[in-house]
Amino acid sequence: MKISFHGQSCIKIITGDTTILVDPFISGNDKCDLKAEEQMPDFIVLSHGHDDHVGDTVEIAKNSGATVICNADLASFLAVEDGLENIAPMHIGGKRQFSFGQVKLTQAFHGSQTVRDGRIVNLGFPTGIVFTIEDKNIYFAGDTGLFSDMKLIGELNPLDVAFLPIGDNFTMGPEDAAIAARFLQAKLVVPMHYNTFPLIAQDPHKFVASLDEGITGKVLEIGEGIEI
C-alpha cells in the first residue's frame, strides 16, 4: 500500500487496484500537485464539511463515479444539494467494511459548515478516520484540537501511521500535536494541515524533531509517498 501527501490535508491511498482520496482540496490550493480533472479514485473520504477539505469532491465524484464516505449530515447535503448518488453515510463510533478494508469514524474537536447561496449550512460533526487496510491501521486525525481520548484511539487500533494537523489557530499546533503523537503511539507520525496560507505557517521539520524519543516522524513533501 502506498500513501502520498498532496498538500493541506489531502492524501491518496493506493491499495491493490483501488485508489482512495481523502479531503481532496485541489483547486485553489497552490500547495497541491494534483489536477482535479485527472483524478479517478474509487473512493473519496471526507473528514468534515469545510471547503478546504470537501474541495473538489463533487466534480471528482461525478467524473469518476467514486463512492463518497463521510458523516451522514454531510452525506445528505451532498446528495440533495449537489446530486451525488454514490454516498456511504456514517457517524462517529461506527465502522464499515468496504472493498478495500474498514473505515471507522472517530471524534474530532473542530467545526463543519459551509456557506451556500448566502446561508450558513451546518454539516454535522467533524471526524477523524481510522482506516484498516492490508492489516495496517492508519489514523487520519482530520482537523482537530488535542483530546485525551486519542490515547484510546491508539489503544483500540494499534497504529502504523498517524496523520496529524500542526498548523495551529484552526487546529492543534506543533506542541499539542507532539502530545497527540505521545498519546497515539503510532509507529510513524506525519504532519499535515500547515503552510497552505500564512495563518497556519509552521516548520514541519521542527515538529518532527520535537517528538518524544522513540516516536518516528516523517515530513512528506508535496507528492511524496510512503509504502507500508
From Swiss-Prot:
Domain of life: Bacteria
InterPro entries attached to this UniProt entry: Metallo-B-lactamas (IPR001279), RibonucZ/Hydroxyglut_hydro (IPR036866), UPF0173 (IPR022877), UPF0173_UPF0282_UlaG_hydrolase (IPR050114)
GO molecular function, one term: hydrolase activity
Keyword Methyltransferase: no
Key words, A-Z: Hydrolase
Family per similarity comment: Belongs to the UPF0173 family.
Record's protein name: UPF0173 metal-dependent hydrolase LMOf2365_1599
Source organism per UniProt: Listeria monocytogenes serotype 4b (strain F2365)
